[in-house]
Amino acid sequence: MLSKAIQLTKSIYQSFLPAPDTPSTPPGAKGEIQPEKDSAPSGQTDQIDYNKLHTSNAARLVDIEHSSVLVVGANTGEDCREFIDLGASRVDGLDVIDEVGAAFTNERTTYYKQSIERTNLQSNQYDLIFSFATMEHVTDIHAGFTEMARLLKPGGVLYSIAAPLWNSAYGHHMTCFHGHPWVHLVFDRSGILSYANQNGIQGERGHDIVDIVDYMLDLKFFNKRSSAEYLDAAARQRCLSIARNDLEGGDPTLLNHPLGQAVLQRYRSDEILPVVHTLIATKTA
């Protein structure tokens, strides 16, 4: 497989995420292909740094200077850097990649090469658990949210943004298919390759189209879960007081594309339009 497939950076999400609202305050709270930065969606003229925006929003939900933070999906450490810069007293980073934390080290930061589905970390130790553009890669969403809840202190805040969701127009994350919505849901592997050949799609950033398609269809990198499964997995967390558990995003005009019409033969529109799942909650006990 491709040498950097599992190092999924966050920059691709700039093209797919809607501008978020002001963060909700929870009750009781004070693979080996790196997707590249894409242009703003049609109708947007300004590029938003969603990573920085969401770390800032999450930090405002706690007393960050006296808070311990766990970043789930820390990658090489940039999200951890953001929380250190915001003044967090301690930041731990969790990821499955060998290079976890390679780009940022700090005396207040520790990294763990583990999956959020099951860790050996101590329970009830974090004031804030932050996950951005990560849960769509986690096979067992329920196990991931359950583990986050276990690791939170009572009164601690969970802030999770999963995007783009698999069933959304570009849930495969590959920019070379931009303008060809839901190609990954309409066709199987051979069909995608045939469609790419017919439409002059050759791959991206030095990776040929065969490697790109094999990567985006690999369950090791994408969980292929429906948007409803995120809502259900979050709602089943009995120790969390939930401020937000919702779906947003999606451009309904994409359904007018021939691929949009084709995907509607298999899915309802409400199953394929949502791009983002947001979970913001406080641990009650």
Model-derived features: positions:
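A C-terminal cap/extension of S-adenosyl-L-methionine-dependent methyltransferases
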Residues: S3-K4, E107, V210-D211, M216-A285
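Conserved alpha-helix/loop element of class I SAM-dependent methyltransferases that forms part
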Residues: Q47-H66, E82
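Conserved class I S-adenosyl-L-methionine
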Residues: H66-N75, V157-G200
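Class I SAM-dependent methyltransferase SAM/SAH-binding core
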Residues: N75-R118
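A short acidic, Gly/Pro-enriched loop at the edge of an enzyme's catalytic core
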Residues: E117-I129
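A short SAM/SAH-binding and catalytic strip from SAM-dependent methyltransferases
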Residues: L128-D140
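A short glycine-rich, Lys/Arg-flanked "PGG" loop and its adjoining helix->strand segment in the class I
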Residues: H142-V157
